[in-house]
Amino acid sequence: GILVGTPNWSQDVDVAAEKPLKGYQNIMYTLHFYAGTHGSWLRDKAQKALDKGLPLFVSEFGISDASGNGNLNKTEGNAWIRFLNKNKISYLGWSLCNKAESSALIKSSVSKTTNWTSKDLTDWGRWLKSKF
């Protein structure tokens, strides 16, 4: 399949739904969100796109703010996961790294590149793992 980005950091999926690409069977449109910044208003935009038949894939999300840092908003994150599961939308969390920021899945003190355990994960990493 082909993933197609949408305007405004892959948030304007409702705009893409107004004029989708024609003649292709293997296209999905990307949606990005950070639960600390993007709430129900962005889910409403996604719902409008879904209502028009636009296939969506979340190719980047986190539960920090949009900077990739700040506090984790697990309440809003859970609302997003419920929305994605209800609408059968697949998703990828950002970011599989050990950078010292809220959106890193691996603790900054961890240097190994494989065979991580729950002890190696950040709070965000453990939260995301619990969703699978």
Feature roles, as predicted:
Residues 1-90, 94-98, 103-131:
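Extracellular glycoside hydrolase catalytic/binding regions
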